[in-house]
């Protein structure tokens, strides 16, 4: 295992000063892309994801449409300037293709695709800045963009990450912890339905640490959910004030 440039955990605090069970600052804005049907920007600390939703609209080519449900397509992409690493090819990387599939599968349980037969919903996600936990920030952004577009949903899907750092379970991995930690677990969670839609494991986890991590993930997701709800409410209260003058 590579040695980190600074201690990841010291005197009970992480390298960025957080406690093990503490999220970075969460910032959420809804309706940020004017030419999309729905959009959201989500930041977990320095990690920032923007999602834009287009649809529902007619499926083209038509032979790909389904008679009893809609089709959701998700594209995850990291902007060339999102990391310090040089990106030489504009084509999607294998990692981006894999994460796009993972995010689609994590969103589908929340979206009532049966309401949109023979239609498609396109979700585009761009990572503007990457400092760990990009797929879970993307999941939250995409879910909010779908809600902003008025897509029928069973619940919001909130993404958080948990990991193992020096044997300690921590919430919301930053880039340093992502690169040098002993394990990570991205999670997608629907707080109202209390249902997981994404659960991936990397590293060696004992049963006890895994269960501890699940509990911490739920705690983090419920916190992000409150911030997300407030962002949605603020947008539509502002619209109501513009329309009704109150």
Swiss-Prot record:
Keywords: Cytoplasm, Exonuclease, Exosome, Hydrolase, Nuclease
Pfam families associated with the record: RNase_PH (PF01138), RNase_PH_C (PF03725)
GO molecular function per UniProt: 3'-5'-RNA exonuclease activity; RNA binding
Transmembrane segments: none
Cellular component GO terms, alphabetical: cytoplasmic exosome (RNase complex)
Subcellular location: Cytoplasm
E.C. number(s) listed in UniProt: 3.1.13.-
SS bonds (residue pairs): none
One Gene Ontology biological process: gene expression
UniProt enzyme class: hydrolase
InterPro entries: ExoRNase_PH_dom1, ExoRNase_PH_dom2, ExoRNase_PH_dom2_sf, PNPase/RNase_PH_dom_sf, Ribosomal_Su5_D2-typ_SF, RNase_PH, Rrp41
Family the entry assigns: Belongs to the RNase PH family. Rrp41 subfamily.
Family annotation (NCBIfam families): ECX1 (TIGR02065)
UniProt subunit comment: Component of the archaeal exosome complex. Forms a hexameric ring-like arrangement composed of 3 Rrp41-Rrp42 heterodimers. The hexameric ring associates with a trimer of Rrp4 and/or Csl4 subunits.
Known function: Catalytic component of the exosome, which is a complex involved in RNA degradation. Has 3'->5' exoribonuclease activity. Can also synthesize heteromeric RNA-tails.
Name of protein: Exosome complex component Rrp41
Native species: Pyrobaculum calidifontis (strain DSM 21063 / JCM 11548 / VA1)
Organism ancestry: Archaea, Thermoproteota, Thermoprotei, Thermoproteales, Thermoproteaceae
Gene this chain is encoded by: rrp41
């Amino acid at each position: 295992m590579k040695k980190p440039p600074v201690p990841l955990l010291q005197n009970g605090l992480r390298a960025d000063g957080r406690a093990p069970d503490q999220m970075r600052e969460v910032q959420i804005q809804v309706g940020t892309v004017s030419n999309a049907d729905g959009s959201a920007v989500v930041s977990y600390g320095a990690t920032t994801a923007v999602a834009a939703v287009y649809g529902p609209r007619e499926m083209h080519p038509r032979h790909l449409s389904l008679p009893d449900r809609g089709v959701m397509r998700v594209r995850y992409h990291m902007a060339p300037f999102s990391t310090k690493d040089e990106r030489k090819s504009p084509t999607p990387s294998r990692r981006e293709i894999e994460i796009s599939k993972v995010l689609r599968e994590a969103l589908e349980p929340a979206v009532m695709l049966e309401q949109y037969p023979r239609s498609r919903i396109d979700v585009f996600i761009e990572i503007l800045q990457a400092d760990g936990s990009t797929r879970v920030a993307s999941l939250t952004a995409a879910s909010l963009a779908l809600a902003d577009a008025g897509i029928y949903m069973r619940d919001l899907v909130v993404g958080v990450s948990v990991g193992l750092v020096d044997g300690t379970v921590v919430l919301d991995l930053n880039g340093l912890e992502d690169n040098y930690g002993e394990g990570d677990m991205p999670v997608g969670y629907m707080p109202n339905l209390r249902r997981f839609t994404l659960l991936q494991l990397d590293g060696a986890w004992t049963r006890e640490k895994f269960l501890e991590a699940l509990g911490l993930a739920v705690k983090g997701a419920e916190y992000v959910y409150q911030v997300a709800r407030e962002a949605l409410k603020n947008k539509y209260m502002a619209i109501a004030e513009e329309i009704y003058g109150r």
